[in-house]
Amino acid sequence: MKLSVIFTTYNSPEWLRKVLWGFSAQTDLDFEVVVADDGSGPETEAVIQAALAEGLSIQHIWQPDDGFNKCQILNKAIIAATGDYLIFTDGDCVPRRDFVAQHRLAMAPGHFLSGGYFKLSMPVSQALTREDVIEQRCFQSDWLTQGGMKKSLKSLKLSGSEFWQPWLNRLTPTKPTWNGHNASCFKADALAVNGFDQRLRYGGLDREFGERLVNAGLSPKQIRYSAVTVHLDHPRSYESAEGWAFNHAIRSQVRKEKITVTPAGIQQLAH
């Protein structure tokens, strides 16, 4: 089965380049990348063209810059995706080399997958080279410590140990939820809930999508120690208390009324 990896980007060509390095290093290469672009300039197109020239399968889905419209461009990417199974991550998340393979291994009807991510500092994010990604140094806790990052229990996500991964996935107290940095589902399930709610602003919009999947009968499956990305640091210019409150109100309604289909999703794109 062909998989589609979907992630958004907005005028972050250097971060996008690092993310695409990660996808070029995957052990499972039977996938396409769908870049959901919320209005970036020509620098982003140049990065994508360079990755295409190196053999990575990419669709570039672009819409004009009209403020924060992440959910709208995600819905356009879902429509364009040619895979029957969709992996969602972000344009600031570099995948470990087994990222696609782990999602393929764990996917199952009636479930969506909840993967993990490890936050990098800004200095480490900026210093990350192609060789660091290809050689997977950015997933080694000792290398990160040398770059100034402190060791923590969260570093266990990076190990890639086939022995420990399933145990850690079962033992973690963290509930599996839809995390926009690293989650996946069948395309049919995403379409059944009408995709992402285009009314939502920055903050928790991915969780709302997952809550509707649960309302529709899907069970979340934990793979946060199996499928891993490292998260590049960045400013959050769209974040606001008002936006979080607006989204929280919609999420509360979704949970209370067990809503499955958003009234402002894929089906409304053409209207």
What does each model-found stretch correspond to?
Residues 2-4, 32, 208:
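Cell-envelope/extracellular polymer assembly enzymes that use nucleotide-activated donors
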Residues 181, 202-209:
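Acidic donor-binding loop at a coil-to-helix junction in glycosyltransferase catalytic cores
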Residues 64-81, 98:
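Glycine-rich, basic loop-to-helix element that forms the pyrophosphate-binding segment
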Residues 21-30:
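Short, acidic, metal-binding catalytic loop of nucleotide-sugar glycosyltransferases
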Residues 86:
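Short aromatic/hydrophobic "clamp" motif used to bind/position activated sugar donors
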Residues 30-40, 59-64:
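Short beta-strand/loop segment that forms part of the nucleotide-sugar
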Residues 98-148:
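Conserved donor NDP-sugar-binding/catalytic core segment of glycosyltransferases
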Residues 37-47, 93:
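A conserved acidic beta->alpha catalytic loop
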